[in-house]
Amino acid sequence: MGRQRHTTTDEALKLVWESADPINRPVVTGTYFISKENERSLMAPYPAVFNWVDGDEYKIAYVHPLPANALIRVGTAGFGFVLMHRNAVAQMRKVHGATTYFNETGVGEQFVSEDINFFRLMYKAGVPLYTHTGATVKHMKRFALDVEYYKFFWEKDERP
């Protein structure tokens, strides 16, 4: 996998910071976007914010469409923009012991990436996760600037 970068702003950080609370909202993420179509010229963006499907800890669904500028409770998220109070990890240790929390797990249909697995373990420990949809950051990914992108950009409307 190529190098990934997230760029933030003071405004996004302030929204996440002001939304956090050591007891009620010990973990708050901002929002960035990902795509399942990384090799295509024009990637369809989806928020890296998910809810569990039918309580299954290995099945997730995008929170899409994304509510505008809202603080919402979610099941899991990407790990690119996270503010976490140390109480969250203390609670995880009470439930899971001293183990590795940031690793991939499962195979096939039960494969989950390291960020989703971290939040899965956090969820199982009873630590709530919130996302602020107004605290958006750029997720720098590789994509081609080619004719498909050109057509999409310029034929979208009749710009001079």
Model-assigned labels for residue ranges:
Residues R86-N87, Q91-P160:
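C-terminal catalytic/acceptor-binding lobe
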